[in-house]
Amino acid sequence: MSQTKTAKVRVTLFFILAGGVLAMVAVVTDHWAVLSPHLEHHNETCVAAHFGLWRICTTWVAMHNQDKNCDGTIPAGEKNCSYFRHFNPGESSEIFEFTTQKEYSISAAAIAIFSLGFIIIGSICAFLSFGNKRDYLLRPASMFYAFAGLCLIVSVEVMRQSVKRMIDSEDTVWIEYYYSWSFACACAGFTLLFLGGLFLLLFSLPRMPQNPWESCMDTESEH
């Protein structure tokens, strides 16, 4: 591999590494979306929540101002985090919580785990490619990185549908939401992994002969 291609491969791997770090941060954190109810009276207790792939954290905050939503009140108040429990306001949402939302959470988490697995396998191939005459390992590595990006964006879409289902359900108190920084990390990780994988594949492909006789000359030189 030429010096120019080697430099391009290393720069691409750096961006892929950044995408892998962002994917890991998104998977292990609980700030994919923030949910909040609409308050009819300013002195009510706000039950806000933020959640990720594995658990939801609900916060009870007493509202003493005229604002009828509890955006930005997540850090304060009494917080309760539980795994695969997307609603804690009361018993009426228990069935919905343990069936529909748990299925969404498990599906999104499983797909995200596949994404991390592809990242690990791709990194192993990329590391081994730095050995003597092992540039061909960059090609499967690039495919694994692209697959990791695709799995990550599928997980993002599953979570987006989960949030939409929460908001539309009559069994929950959530009517307002916004996507938080973990969601942004997942989207950025998808972009870096998928595009990085495609560029890595292009850079690792052998140079096509510009003239018909170049391939013949290469064959004769090998003998």
UniProtKB/Swiss-Prot annotation:
Expression across tissues: Skeletal muscle.
Transmembrane parts of this sequence: 11-29, 110-130, 136-156, 181-205
Record localization: Cell membrane, Sarcolemma
InterPro entries the record matches: PMP22/EMP/MP20/Claudin, VDCC_g1su, VDCC_gsu
Signal sequence segment: none
Keywords of the record: Calcium, Calcium channel, Calcium transport, Cell membrane, Disulfide bond, Glycoprotein, Ion channel, Ion transport, Membrane, Transmembrane, Transmembrane helix, Transport, Voltage-gated channel
Maturation and modification: N-glycosylated.
Cytoplasmic side: 1-10, 131-135, 206-223
Domain of life: Eukaryota
One MF term in the entry's GO annotations: voltage-gated calcium channel activity
Record topological domains on the Extracellular side: 30-109, 157-180
Glycosylated residues (UniProt): 43, 80
Cysteine pairings via disulfide bonds: 57-81
Stored Gene3D superfamilies: 1.20.140.150
Pfam families in the cross-refs: Claudin_2
A single GO cellular-component term on record: T-tubule
Membrane topology: Multi-pass membrane protein
Gene Ontology biological process terms in this record: calcium ion transmembrane transport; establishment of localization in cell; regulation of calcium ion transmembrane transport via high voltage-gated calcium channel; sarcoplasmic reticulum calcium ion transport
Entry similarity comment: Belongs to the PMP-22/EMP/MP20 family. CACNG subfamily.
Function description: Regulatory subunit of the voltage-gated calcium channel that gives rise to L-type calcium currents in skeletal muscle. Regulates channel inactivation kinetics.
PANTHER family hit by this protein: VOLTAGE-DEPENDENT CALCIUM CHANNEL GAMMA-1 SUBUNIT, VOLTAGE-DEPENDENT CALCIUM CHANNEL GAMMA-1 SUBUNIT-RELATED
Assembly description: Component of a calcium channel complex consisting of a pore-forming alpha subunit (CACNA1S) and the ancillary subunits CACNB1 or CACNB2, CACNG1 and CACNA2D1. The channel complex contains alpha, beta, gamma and delta subunits in a 1:1:1:1 ratio, i.e. it contains either CACNB1 or CACNB2.
Protein name: Voltage-dependent calcium channel gamma-1 subunit
